Amino acid sequence: MKTDLQLRAINIIRELRQGQNASQAYVAELLDLRSSGLVGNIESPRFPHKYTLKQLSVLCEAFQYPFENLFLDEKETLLPYKERIKLLINKIIDYDG
């Protein structure tokens, strides 16, 4: 089962993909995946698959979206720098856990 944090990041990527009229096949190609079906599995809450941190980085770059915004909400992005970075690191660790 995916965590709330994993679902948040995956849903943001899906919304970015759909907003730019990009297909799951396009995402699969960006990530050098063998099948767009894997992207479907990642986007589905029914399967445990998730993007790796490297894949999220590639997708954020492709969709011109700040990587940290996958993990931090608007309020958290306004925290002082050190506090924000510490929170971001902890959330990235939680995502990957």
PLM segments and residue spans:
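Recognition helix of helix-turn-helix/homeodomain-like DNA-binding domains
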Residues: 32-50
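Core residues of bacterial helix-turn-helix
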Residues: 20, 31-32, 63
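Residue-level signal for the short linker/turn that defines the boundary of a DNA-recognition helix
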Residues: 11, 21-22, 51-54
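The alpha-helix within a helix-turn-helix
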Residues: 17, 28, 60
